[in-house]
Amino acid sequence: MSRHEGVSCDSCLKSNFNGRRYKCLICYDYDLCADCYEDGVTSTRHLVEHPMQCILTRSDIELYFGGEMLASDQPQSFTCPYCKKMGFSDATLLEHVSAEHTETSLEVVCPVCAGLPGGEPNLVTDDFAGHLTLEHRQGPRELISFLDEPSAIRHGGGVRRIPGRTLGGPRTRRSNMHFSSSSGLSALSPSGRESVDPIAELLSQLSGVRRGGPPTSQLQQLQMQMQLDRQQVTASRQIDRLPRRAHPIVSTSNSNAAMAEVISGGAGGSGGSGAVGSGSGGGSGATAPPNLRTTEWPVTASFSTSASNHSQTQSSLAANSLNAREAIGTSSSAGSNVLGISVGVGGTANGNGGAGSSGVATGAGGAGQGGGQGGAAAGESFLLAQFMQPTFTEAEWAVVESMRADRSMFVQSLMLSMLCTEALDLNASDESLAKSDNVNKGQQQQQEDAEAEAQAETLLNNNADVEQQQQQQQLQPAMVRQVNQMQQTSPEDFVCDEYRYKNKKANTTQTSGTGGLGGAGATAAPGGGASGAGTKPTADRGIERRSGRPPPGEMATGSQQPQQQQQSTANPAASQQKYKQNASAATAAGNTNQIPDTR
């Protein structure tokens, strides 16, 4: 069952919801789902301070407590409706309420009834402690139901056994206990029977009076019967879950219980009889030693009886170990057994233990006595037989040695193969690492070479740029000077220089002609031509003053003047023609000399 059937959340109105269910122990019929409870939902009648009982579904209980030996039909903890403390069982809740809330008379909802599958979910009571005492008190009386109690009392067998002393281990929860009056009668002797608990009898009478008659008592009996049926079903399920054992065992934790229920006795001779040791005279037998791991006494022994006290008894005891086989054989004399356990019925049973062993005797119908006596010498026997070394034949030893050798060879070959595999893996990994290192080194070298070439190219480019800049810087002043010269000398200057040169040449020619005429016509002034030739006209001085530099043909004109005179004297025709030219040049010079010099 994974849903809360027939239950709806009073906040979100979700019906048949999954998960945890929280029931308010103050408000009547008020339930919340896990989400609404965690959100702290409140209403006009419900507050956050109200105690809530958490109820789980059967599937959730199996999920949470599946590996534990707990009942699956009841919640594992209850909440106090007065102080909101959690984690109580039904018994501890009763003790808590009786100790701390005796004077509280608030009407609350019973959390035990609300948590039980077949209980009343909305049972409101103002005497919560009394309700727990009458309805949910399950103490030492839980081993006998209310339906079986009157018949047990009538037959004189009203026995209530303590749960901690029953067979099958200590009690974990009350639902794990199932019982019957017949088992109680067969387990205990008449001297160990207990009388009816007077407090329980008084409470049962008060419950009948409080409920007001037989119908209420019958209802209580029906409820107890239903609860008993549920407990029996739960116990049967848990027994089915337990592992099957091949032989019955007796736990050492329950050693005080009656061993007659487990050990079945048989009739013997005059000395005594029992399931453990049997014989005539003193009684001899053997049993298995206690298992040191589980502290249990397995009754698995093979017995051999002897007719006299001097007969020898041999028992084969098998003990399980982890990886070895132990075959234990023991023999004892003088009518002794290993543990000296003998059971007598209606008489006296004596058990003589071996060397250093103890004797145990129990009786169901009468009294039993047992004693342990020491053997001849402590060194001749062993206290713990299971630690005796087994004896093997040569063939068995050979088989054992061969198996050991096979195992050692197998382990050796396995280790060698593993080491070889690891070595191969390491070599392969080293080779791959070496290859990768070589590849990385080659790539790194290529990168370095490329970087070096790039740096060299950049250096060459930088040097070329520097040289070009230097050349440009050197050529720039020359170009500037050339430009300045070109700016200073224009075409007009060349025209002016040529004009000046022509004028000066014409003046020179005129002056040379005038001097010749004066020398030829007047004898009174023989040096007139020379003087005329030696003086510069005013026009020449003006032109020379304007130009600021001598004409390039001045020296040539001065040198040509005596040559012209010689030619004129040597060739009269040429001199006449030259005279005409000089005259024309003189008239032209006279025209030019008429310009006044304003400077």
Curated annotation (Swiss-Prot):
**What PANTHER family does the record point to?**
E3 UBIQUITIN-PROTEIN LIGASE KCMF1
Where is there biased composition of kind Low complexity?
Answer: 160-170, 180-192, 559-593
Give the source species.
Drosophila melanogaster
Under what name is this protein listed? E3 ubiquitin-protein ligase Kcmf1
> What family is reported?
Belongs to the KCMF1 family.
> Record's InterPro entries?
Di19_Zn-bd (IPR008598), KCMF1/Dystrophin (IPR050774), Znf_ZZ (IPR000433), Znf_ZZ_sf (IPR043145)
Keywords, comma-separated and alphabetical: Metal-binding, Transferase, Ubl conjugation pathway, Zinc, Zinc-finger
Where is the stretch described as Disordered? 155-193, 229-253, 269-294, 466-486, 507-599
